[in-house]
């Protein structure tokens, strides 16, 4: 459906001169991200584990690589796309790559949870060094069929023509998500 929408926009732009731009937005996250998305699952679970309201988080592919940006940056890019002198197609991304496991490690560090990773593959686990409990494990049922292992965007065109670049780093995004989640329990 995304590909169809893209080509429909291009068709109407070219055929009828409609101001129709496409924004190809790589993964963009915020504290309000839905609970079925991996970043939200990770943040929510680690905050709950820290507060002793949850024991373990079960995930799929820890080695999927994503280009995660902050939704605030992406909203700004959308506005800039609409202000540009002519319609065009744009890639909005951070040009940064991070594995799911790296995202977990950053979140854990922010929450002062020291993880010890053990084993490889489907048996890989993370143990909280303080409590000695397994708090992250893997289950095949969370591996998505047809999942793309590597997603990284190049926003150089937007940088050059729109003068847009992301302001928020991954640590800022993680901090915002964690603070939002912690506030729900205070």
Descriptions of predicted regions:
Residues 1-21, 43-51:
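Active-site Tyr-X1-5-Lys
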Residues 21-24, 92:
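Short glycine/serine/threonine-enriched helix-capping/active-site loop
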Residues 26-29:
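Proline-glycine-enriched beta-turn/loop adjacent to the NAD(P) cofactor-binding site
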Residues 33-186:
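C-terminal substrate-binding subdomain of Rossmann-fold SDR/epimerase-dehydratase oxidoreductases
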């Amino acid at each position: 459906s995304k590909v169809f929408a893209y080509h429909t926009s291009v068709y109407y732009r070219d055929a009828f001169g409609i101001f129709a731009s496409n924004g190809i937005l790589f993964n963009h996250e915020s504290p309000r991200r839905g609970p079925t998305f991996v970043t939200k699952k990770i943040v929510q679970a680690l905050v709950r584990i820290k507060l002793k309201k949850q024991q373990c988080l079960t995930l799929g592919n820890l080695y999927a690589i994503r280009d995660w940006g902050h939704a605030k940056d992406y909203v700004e890019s959308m506005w800039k796309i609409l202000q540009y002198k002519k319609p065009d197609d744009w890639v909005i991304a951070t040009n940064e790559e991070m594995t799911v496991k790296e995202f977990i490690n950053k979140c854990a560090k922010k929450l002062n949870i020291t993880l010890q990773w053990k084993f490889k593959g489907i048996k890989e686990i993370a143990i909280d060094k303080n409590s000695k409990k397994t708090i992250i494990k893997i289950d095949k049922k969370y591996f998505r069929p047809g999942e793309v292992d590597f997603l990284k965007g190049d926003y150089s065109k937007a940088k050059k023509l729109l003068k847009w670049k992301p302001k928020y780093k991954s640590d800022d995004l993680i901090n915002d998500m964690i603070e939002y989640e912690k506030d729900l329990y205070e």
